[in-house]
Swiss-Prot record:
It is an enzyme of class 3 (hydrolase). Gene3D superfamilies: 2.70.40.10. One of its GO terms (biological process) is dUMP biosynthetic process. This is Deoxyuridine 5'-triphosphate nucleotidohydrolase. It comes from Nitrobacter hamburgensis (strain DSM 10229 / NCIMB 13809 / X14). Its cofactor is Mg(2+). The keyword DNA repair does not apply. Substrate binds at R72, S73, G74, N85, T89, V90, D91. Its EC number is 3.6.1.23. Belongs to the dUTPase family. InterPro entries: dUTPase (IPR008181), dUTPase-like (IPR029054), dUTPase-like_sf (IPR036157), dUTPase_trimeric (IPR033704). The gene is dut.
Length: 152
């Protein structure tokens, strides 16, 4: 992959035997994260339940980058399973395991098995800003119109 940045990754013992996250098409934006739950005890999410799902993955993002953990559209569309804190942010200085907070918004229990692709991780540059106090702000045609103010 030309222009790719290198990210060092480690797998914890409970992820042994699982492949590193990978892109599953040539134009995919996200690397698929897999569940590192025990083979013998899959995780069952009842309808309305949420759980932290381990991936067994630790990464060292370069300065100026972040990773976002986002839902997989197929899980959401077919089963109502999504990432509860979407997008979950992984900061460049974080060196702990990446876990995925999944919620089952569907009507039936959903079983998460070892190695199942449960979320996608997008790595992107971060723009840092410096906020400055201001007495007034420039006017816009939208003004303070918020949720739904621009129509359907």
């Amino acid at each position: 992959m030309s222009g790719a940045i290198r990210i060092d990754a480690q797998q914890l013992p409970h992820a042994e035997g699982l492949p590193l996250p990978a892109y599953h098409s040539s134009q995919a934006a996200g690397l698929d994260l897999m569940a590192a739950v025990p083979e013998q005890t899959p995780l069952v999410l009842a309808a309305g339940q949420y759980a932290m799902v381990p991936t067994g993955l630790i990464i060292a993002l370069p300065d100026g980058f972040e990773a976002q953990v986002r839902p997989r559209s197929g899980l959401a569309a077919k089963h109502g399973v999504t990432v509860l804190n979407s997008p979950g942010t992984v900061d460049a200085d974080y060196r702990g395991e990446i876990n995925v907070l999944l919620v089952n918004l569907g009507n039936a229990p959903f079983t998460i098995r070892r190695g199942e692709r449960i979320a996608q991780m997008i790595v992107a540059p971060v723009t840092r800003v410096e906020l400055a106090r201001a007495v007034s702000l420039s006017a816009t045609s939208r003004g303070s119109g918020g949720f739904g103010s621009t129509g359907r």
